[in-house]
Amino acid sequence: MDVLLANPRGFCAGVDRAIEIVKRAIETLGAPIYVRHEVVHNRFVVDDLKQRGAIFVEELDEVPDDATVIFSAHGVSQAVRQEAERRGLKVFDATCPLVTKVHFEVARHCRAGRDVVLIGHAGHPEVEGTMGQWSRERGAGTIYLVEDIEQVATLDVRQPDNLAYTTQTTLSVDDTMGIIEALRARYPAMQGPRHDDICYATQNRQDAVRDLARQCDLVLVVGSPNSSNSNRLSELARRDGVESYLIDNASEIDPAWIVGKQHIGLTAGASAPQVLVDGVLERLRELGAAGVSELEGEPESMVFALPKELRLRLVS
């Protein structure tokens, strides 16, 4: 039995930035630092930041006056930003810049009076934040959420000739393209983003897991169950006909999964750290894995800048 590692895998630039913002805020301002929602969807990362002095909350009313709060990588609504400003909270924004790009698109369409269709998963914090970029004060348009291709048939927009779409950044590329095609068939005048909203890291990791699926008879995806992009990776492998499981860490591996398997693929979602992958590799060796190799993949060199104040504090 051998193990093939996907490439790329694990942390993306947006996740790296978000985690670093929390760490540096704690180092420079001191604990506690409040973080609205899990800064990224990974239990190991969140637990580590808690030990350093981060306090995770779901709403700003859990944050004391005069405290520092960090917005998670998934982004927040305008209402949350306005509440933080009204209360005078010190804010560091860890929203992924690629999510911010989608926010700007929604706000632009809103100002132009267009209706907007957001393709995404209801209840996901990124979707809630993006939906919250629309406001009646900004324009006359309306925003609609579409989760799957079936909902396109029943969608009833107010302005079919003045319509645009945008997407959550962590969706299945194939599923999203199907929804977009159905929307365009129904609303030929619909506008789209200048560049795809699904982020480069999501695309690259989905391409990599498909490479694994072509060569393996089992694919393990390291990631937490509330991680959208990690779930999509496991779904893609299964869709390509390969047995696949999403695991938080090595302790969740069932030895029965690898019985009779010759080639095990291993990847990690964009919010899963390499240390968890290393732990899975160690467990697979204990279960009989004889060799580990890494597939070629798309190189990633993207780096997102930290907030200016945290950059300055590092050298002061």
Curated annotation (Swiss-Prot):
S-S bridge residues: none
Cofactor note: Binds 1 [4Fe-4S] cluster per subunit.
Binding positions (isopentenyl diphosphate): H41, H74, H124, S227, S228, N229, S271
Associated pathway: Isoprenoid biosynthesis; dimethylallyl diphosphate biosynthesis; dimethylallyl diphosphate from (2E)-4-hydroxy-3-methylbutenyl diphosphate: step 1/1; Isoprenoid biosynthesis; isopentenyl diphosphate biosynthesis via DXP pathway; isopentenyl diphosphate from 1-deoxy-D-xylulose 5-phosphate: step 6/6
CDD domains reported in the protein's UniProt record: lytB_ispH
Catalytic activity: isopentenyl diphosphate + 2 oxidized [2Fe-2S]-[ferredoxin] + H2O = (2E)-4-hydroxy-3-methylbut-2-enyl diphosphate + 2 reduced [2Fe-2S]-[ferredoxin] + 2 H(+); dimethylallyl diphosphate + 2 oxidized [2Fe-2S]-[ferredoxin] + H2O = (2E)-4-hydroxy-3-methylbut-2-enyl diphosphate + 2 reduced [2Fe-2S]-[ferredoxin] + 2 H(+)
Entry annotated with the keyword Iron-sulfur: yes
EC class (word): oxidoreductase
Binding residue positions for (2E)-4-hydroxy-3-methylbut-2-enyl diphosphate: H41, H74, H124, T169, S227, S228, N229, S271
Residues engaged in binding dimethylallyl diphosphate: H41, H74, H124, S227, S228, N229, S271
Metal-binding among keywords: yes
GO terms assigned for molecular function: 4 iron, 4 sulfur cluster binding; 4-hydroxy-3-methylbut-2-enyl diphosphate reductase activity; metal ion binding
BP GO terms, sorted: dimethylallyl diphosphate biosynthetic process; isopentenyl diphosphate biosynthetic process, methylerythritol 4-phosphate pathway; terpenoid biosynthetic process
Protein origin, superkingdom: Bacteria
The enzyme's E.C. designation: 1.17.7.4
Active site: E126
Residues holding [4Fe-4S] cluster: C12, C96, C199
Any Pfam family hit: LYTB
Cofactor: [4Fe-4S] cluster
Assigned keywords, A-Z: 4Fe-4S, Iron, Iron-sulfur, Isoprene biosynthesis, Metal-binding, Oxidoreductase
Database matches in InterPro entries: LytB/IspH
Function field: Catalyzes the conversion of 1-hydroxy-2-methyl-2-(E)-butenyl 4-diphosphate (HMBPP) into a mixture of isopentenyl diphosphate (IPP) and dimethylallyl diphosphate (DMAPP). Acts in the terminal step of the DOXP/MEP pathway for isoprenoid precursor biosynthesis.
PANTHER family xrefs: 4-HYDROXY-3-METHYLBUT-2-ENYL DIPHOSPHATE REDUCTASE (PTHR30426:SF0)
Family named by the database record: Belongs to the IspH family.
Protein name: 4-hydroxy-3-methylbut-2-enyl diphosphate reductase
Organism: Xanthomonas axonopodis pv. citri (strain 306)
